[in-house]
Amino acid sequence: MKKRFPTLLATLIWTALYSQHTLADLAEQCMLGVPTYDQPLVTGDPNQLPVRINADKTEANYPDNALFTGNVIVQQGNSTLTANQVELTQVQKPGEVIPLRTVTATGDVNYDDPQIKLKGPKGWSNLNTKDTDMDKGKYQMVGRQGRGDADLMKLRDQSRYTILKNGTFTSCLPGDNSWSVVGSEVIHDREEQVVEVWNARFKIGKVPVFYSPYMQLPVGDKRRSGFLIPNAKFTSNNGFEFLLPYYWNIAPNFDATITPHYMERRGLQWQNEFRYLLAPGSGTMALDWLPNDRIYTGPDGTDKNATRWLYYWGHSGVMDQVWRFNINYTRVSDPAYFTDLTSQYGSTTDGYATQIFTAGYANENWNATLSSKQFQVFTAAGNSNAYRAQPQLDMNYYKNDVGPFDMHVYGQAAKFTSVNPTNPEASRFHIEPTVNLPLSNSWGSINTEAKLLATHYQQDIPASFADNASNPKLKDSVNRVLPQFKVDGKVVFDRSMDWATGFTQTLEPRAQYLYVPYRNQDDIYIYDTTLMQSDYSGLFRDRTYSGLDRIASANQVSTGLTSRIYDDARVERFNVSVGQIYYFSRSRTGNTEAIDNSNATGSLVWAGDTFWRINDQLGLKGGAQYDTRLGSLTLGNAIMEYRKDADRMIQLNYRYASPKYIQAAVPKVYNPDYQQGISQVGTTASWPIADRWAIVGAYYYDTKAKQPASQLVGLQYNTCCWAVNLGYERKITGWNAQGQTSKYDNKIGFNIELRGLSGGHSLGTAQMLNSGILPYQSAF
């Protein structure tokens, strides 16, 4: 099966590419069956507009009534009534300026206005209020999907309300009764964009499958409390699944969605989402709760019927133009949560959940941010060594135009604690004054910078840690002071291209010298520091490591050259960059990692990036980094993508990370798979293969491990009022240490979706592609 899967995917893509079937846009197809109001709109008070009547025969008793027979047409403003016979009655009530005018129509009665069309054997209408009744008739909305029939239909409040007695509603086009909602009373409110149904029976074809004493269906995008579109699917992991979201419009600045999510194999999960808008900003809180999961038995396999949950809080806002508040907090009950359960707030590939709170104040020349940072790592080893920064205070002060100089002072104070009581903890204080001398004109710039990096650590070292000979020898109190000097200059040349009219090419050389003296930092533990990726832009960074625990020495020159091509609309069509770092002396911090323990000098780090947008549909992008200290190509990636539109796309990609780079960047990683390095080739595609049919596929193969990393194929059929998709996914979910093999999860999914209630008519390819463990990302 493993060998056949790429062949199957390639065959499907080949079939799609060479299909000669001409596809019309689904939205256009659906709107062909929806009536439109194509008459000029009449403005003004309808009661003041004249009534025009045409008929083959007329009998009148002026001014009380008149009888019209034969091809009768009654028009007033934007409303038109046609019938075989119409009786017009006019009654002048005492004290009323305008007489009450009504019409009673019989025989093939049709009524239409810009909102709705009605048809039935008998009808009545109040020409003053536009209230209209129709016996045993049919209706269809104008300009949007929605139709049905009823024993009695009423239009009220200038056609805002359609009231049905023993009526039906469906978004399917005429001639298609795939699904419908039947109720003893149905009220469609066009202003609030909702359909309310009492004694509702949901039917597939002619078969009732669901009953509710009351139901609401949204028929637009306006906020209103009520049940949203239900969703049903089947997966091999969870069995049959059914979701019935309820939207609660609490207030203009508060709303919530409560979704009971039934999973045949696991039980009933409650998905709750609350949204708010306040003076300090807007945010979302979510709580997913699954009591007594019938499959999951806990990390150690002994906790039967475990309760599983997710909590999320996201917030962003500015208050009084100076205060800033941001929250990105996610916590789950167990490391396997995102592997077993689908959530928009995280995925298996994240590896951890972020828990960050920040509050900041910004003024003209300074700002301060107080934060709390923590991470829930989804591996036992990673979580036991995770650190919290609680609290962390960052401050910046800016003073520009001090003569020719710009000044900046950065300061930080942080308290680091570990979830593992045997790990060291620390308080860190850092100050970083900087002086810049920027010079620039229209074609170039040069910036000279000098700064001082002063850091103090007060470390709390447990006795068990200090007594372990394999651990680094730390000091309780450490002071580290480092000066830094940098000169960075770049020039931009441009010229018109002879062989492409209107095109412009640039040549942008750049050079930077950086000096930081060496300080041995073996006596400082690593709390928030990792090796940063050395792409082309990274060649011109000040730091090799993120955070402050390691500041590598530097006596180096970084040089680079970028060339860009712009078309006549100033859209960038091509660029290529290549650069290097030349080391006059080895860069080190004092630790014993491979990248820091090399004595090599000279041109050690090379990096290049390129992008080529061949046309509006086809593009290429890639990059590579080489580090002679590790003796290998460290990172590489390449993407080629053809994207005709949102539903027609083919992407080929490759990504590489060397084993030595991974060990240098994440030295404590345990998984042997990752220690081999990463070398993955993949393809992602989506394409309509026939009228209303669309297929997606994704396949990633790890050439190092010689095994598939992810496989996904999905097939969707779309109509104007429903869609169904069938998908298969096989993904790595973990590592079997005992058998030294990857753990796989195979999932087959079947999903049904009701359509036509809102404006969306996509083929569903984006949703299927984003459901995979490696979601699709556009190359350009």
Swiss-Prot record:
Listed under GO cellular component are: cell outer membrane; transporter complex
Q: Could you name the domain of life of the organism this protein comes from?
A: Bacteria
Q: Which UniProt keywords apply?
A: Cell outer membrane, Membrane, Signal
Q: Which residues does UniProt assign to the signal peptide? A: 1-24
User: Per its UniProt record, what InterPro entries does this chain match?
Assistant: LipoPS_assembly_LptD, LptD, LptD_C, OstA-like_N
Q: Could you tell me the Gene Ontology terms of the biological process aspect for this record? A: Gram-negative-bacterium-type cell outer membrane assembly; lipopolysaccharide transport
Which Pfam families would you find in this protein's record? LptD (PF04453), LptD_N (PF03968)
Q: What is its main location?
A: membrane
**Subcellular location, record wording:** Cell outer membrane
The UniProt entry, under HAMAP family, shows: LPS_assembly_LptD
Per the entry, what this protein does is:
Together with LptE, is involved in the assembly of lipopolysaccharide (LPS) at the surface of the outer membrane.
Q: How does it assemble?
A: Component of the lipopolysaccharide transport and assembly complex. Interacts with LptE and LptA.
Q: Which family does it belong to?
A: Belongs to the LptD family.
Which protein is depicted?
Answer: LPS-assembly protein LptD
Q: What is the lineage of its organism?
A: Bacteria, Pseudomonadati, Pseudomonadota, Gammaproteobacteria, Enterobacterales
Gene that produces this protein = lptD
